[in-house]
Amino acid sequence: ENENVLYLNIEAYAGFGGYFPWEEGQDLSHLLYYSRQENDMLCARMTSMVHRMGSLDYVLPIRVTTDLHTVTTEEWQNLFQRLSKESIYETLLLDIGDSVADLMSLLEMCDWIFIPYAEDVYAKAKMEQWQYMLEVLKRQHLNQSEIRINMEQNMRQAVAEAITELRKREGMS
């Protein structure tokens, strides 16, 4: 609430018409294009792409899934570094799906990883597979960055609990 946050949805099917209005205009693929240009016009270009939902700024997600698959880890890193250094945003909130190439490297860049979960047998099996994958890939240290959000709760309550956990871990509680 007290800082500038930019939400970027990096999922293959982000929910146009539901979460996001189906509108024409520039989206995350355009922001990536401008980031690749290596000039100082990224933030100027970005101002026309930023939309607002309540107190949250966001750029429309990539509309065509195949565009998402072509973005390299280095391009994501470059974009995130440039946004951190050149824009007004102190925090980037990334909604990452598994359609991203080299997901683990992208997660390595994050200070915190919020993981939605539920208590049903299928959700538990997915979490077990996630833990197994971290172990096989020798990325168990990512567990220390995880904050889980119980999706069976009221969303406001779940997010409030996640924020409380985050503050506790950062020594702000």
Show which residues each predicted segment covers.
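Conserved nucleotide-binding/hydrolysis micro-motifs of P-loop NTPases
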Residues: A12-A14, R63-T66, D120-V121
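Structural signal for conserved beta-strand scaffold positions within catalytic alpha/beta enzyme cores
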Residues: Y7-N9, Y58-L60, I115, R148-N150
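Cytosolic-facing regulatory segments adjacent to core modules
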Residues: M41-V50, L60-L94, K124
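Fold-independent oxyanion-binding glycine-rich loops
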Residues: N9-E11, P61-I62, I96-G97
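Charged, alpha-helix-enriched surfaces in structured cytosolic catalytic cores
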Residues: E23-Q26, M41, E74, A101, ...
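Conserved catalytic-core segment of NTP-binding enzymes
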Residues: N78-E165
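Phosphate-binding loop that captures ATP/GTP phosphates
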Residues: E3-Y58
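Short, hydrophobic alpha-helical segments
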Residues: L166-G171
